[in-house]
UniProtKB/Swiss-Prot annotation:
Protein name (database record): Phosphatidylinositol 4-kinase gamma 2
PI3K/PI4K catalytic domain residues: 234-532
PANTHER family: PHOSPHATIDYLINOSITOL 4-KINASE GAMMA, PHOSPHATIDYLINOSITOL 4-KINASE GAMMA 2
EC number annotated for this UniProt entry: 2.7.1.67
Native source organism of the sequence: Arabidopsis thaliana (Mouse-ear cress)
Region described as Disordered: spans on this chain: 228-247
UniProt family annotation: Belongs to the PI3/PI4-kinase family. Type II PI4K subfamily.
Amino acid sequence: MSVADVALSPIHRGSAFAVGGFGQSTTTHYSVKSVLVFLSVSGSTMPMLILESDSIAEVKLRIQTCNGFRVRRQKLVFSGRELARNASRVKDYGVTGGSVLHLVLKLYDPLLVTVITTCGKVFQFHVDRRRNVGYLKKRISKEGKGFPEVDDQEILFKGEKLDDNRIIDGICKDGNSVIHLLVKKSVEDTVKREEDTATGKDSLLEPVVLNPDVKLPEVLEDMIDRTVDGLNKGSPPVRSAEGTGGTYLMQDSSGLNYVSVFKPMDEEPMAVNNPQQLPVSSDGQGLKRGTRVGEGATREVAAYLLDHPKSGLRSVSKEVMGFAGVPPTAMVRSSHKVYNYPNGFSSCATKDAKVGSLQMFMKNNGSCEDIGPGAFPVEEVHKICVFDIRMANADRHAGNILTGKSEEGKTLLIPIDHGYCLPENFEDCTFEWLYWPQAKLPFSADTIDYINSLDSEQDIALLQLHGWNVPEAVSRTLRISTMLLKKGVERNLTPYQIGSVMCRETVNKDSAIEEIVREAHNSVLPASSEATFLEAVSVAMDRRLDELTK
């Protein structure tokens, strides 16, 4: 297991637990104002007592203080909903005494290490990125058949001899978790790849074509071809420690680089084959309100399609990257025994094929969690603001914005993880960039021109052309969010001002956009057309936005 997945089991009312932290000897019965959390890590369970009045941030900090699990590596889930608003109290989410929370922790984030010997033999294994080269040598000696002892090894990376104290994570700075190493010592010819990477005959990956009249762009064809080559050459998918769903890094034919990222529908959070052991959704609702389990892949593809380049619509532009820089994404079906098959892999590639999104792997220097937001270029932040507002993103945080460099050396922000875009309502819209200084600066003229070029009706038609029978509630969300963005720039509002209209201040207080929608709904007859309803939304929105400019 590469992730410590914590499924917290219900307890009986007479159970004893530690008060105020983990592993303490004090024994007490919980009160009606208390919440018991059982963390199961590596086979052991650790109880913790919190109060209903605690904020989510306080609970996470207490977990970090008591057991060292860093706050930013924690995700709390209750009753099928992520407790994402750190300033809100646990009771705002409906948590009461005796409730059971689910915690997912990322404790182990491995790198796939490829060792190539002087005689050309190849060996692969996973190494914790926090380990050093000395540890790597011990692993080579212990696990590699015929490899030399530690003292006889000399390891190089890109021609540079590596010191034993060098940290593995610091060697590979471009975000690619495959390190190519050379062992400068003769090794027996019996060294081979591990058996499970020797052949790709039981694997499958192919595009899902929903409309035969739509030709797959060359960039997506190339990404799929390179991914298939990797599988056929025996380079297995590598499960990522990131996220609450199944995410697999797909390698190229050399096994030295990642090409793409595969997210199966049936392994999404709260789906039936979710590898994180989160409970299966009882009503089909996703972790974010207004989304459904199993629809994340469709939304990932939609995000790329609607990220139009400055030069024009995605359907006619030849540019690979759009305005916001969403990586190229396609719908595929794939099978491999590395994926999560609770009932076992049958070795029948077609039978066990999973449908999901395949997104181009982007070289990066980490995420925005690793850098203070003050260092980000204003235009890079604003492009993400525009995208998130328009798509009503319900899951934008610093961890799903990667940082990179352009060919000219300029800082780039790369938005990923769009499975919770275009929800059916605005209840869970969250934009972390609201708290960044760039969000309080006005949009540039170029960005305003781009915003004014957007057309929600064309966007809906484009999604339908690519095979998504867009639910009416989703179409309405896109129409209203696009309307808000355009009306906002007409009034010279900043990203912060527009984004604040979409986001709730607390869990139980409706956002301004929700109030606008409700006002419009109450002002029209039940049988009114969508056009009539949207006109009512426009009137209510004008009044609310005008108040912001007074």
